[in-house]
Amino acid sequence: TLSTVNINKKNFKWTTDFIYSHAQNKVTSLDNQQRVIDLVAGTGFALEGYPVRSVFSIPYKGLNSEGIPTFLDQDGNVTSTGIYFQERDKIDFLEYSGTADPTDFGSFGNTFSFYGFKVNVFFTYSFGNVVRMDAVFKKRYSDLTAMPKEFKNRWVVPGDEKYTDIPVIASSTQEFNDPNLAYAYNAYNYSSARIAKGDFIRLKEVSLSYDFPQ
């Protein structure tokens, strides 16, 4: 914690308060075996050698020529539908994306006093964590679910896989030819393509007050 008086004159005063915290942890021993689905969930899960709330991802390997996402599976093969979410033994293929808990966080505020008026501007900040983006992709959509903003950049025609990572909206033919197509979209939702930094600086409060002369 750091507090400073930047300016202190008869009718004007400016003060700053700064709070900083750093948190770090590591699981050194763990008996139970986690499943793939536990480790790729955005809430974070424990794995020996990593932070308590670690987030892992299925390695994304791009779209194929039909706009279907592909991944590296537990056997080292590139696949669209071969990810087994209940796997407990072969989990080393997963990518460590980061921790769900921020490692650096705190707040800072400035207070300005001028002829009885007082203005307070307060910010909070948080850095070092990752978030799993919403699981919005699936093999079939309704009018209510086909609304993610990412769809404007989706795969549409062959060759688009060179420029986008957003899967195709599957056709009825694709659904018929691959009854396991839903697995590809589910894996995409939990892949390295759907990870984002959770860093933020947020304006938390702005207040104005006045102290009447006594």
Describe each PLM feature range:
Residues 1, 13, 103-107, 200-207:
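Transmembrane beta-barrel architecture of outer-membrane proteins
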Residues 1-3, 17, 59, 109-111, ...:
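Outer-membrane beta-barrel architecture
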Residues 4-6, 20-26, 114-116, 125-129, ...:
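Transmembrane beta-strands of outer-membrane beta-barrel pores
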Residues 5-100, 140, 151-168:
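Conserved small-residue
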Residues 9, 19, 40, 105, ...:
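Core subunits and conserved enzymes of cellular information-processing
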Residues 14-16, 108, 114, 119-121:
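Transmembrane beta-strands of outer-membrane beta-barrel proteins
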Residues 50-52, 98-103, 193-202:
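Short sequence motifs at beta-strands and strand-loop junctions characteristic
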Residues 127-214:
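Extracytoplasmic gating/loop element in the C-terminal half of outer-membrane beta-barrel translocons
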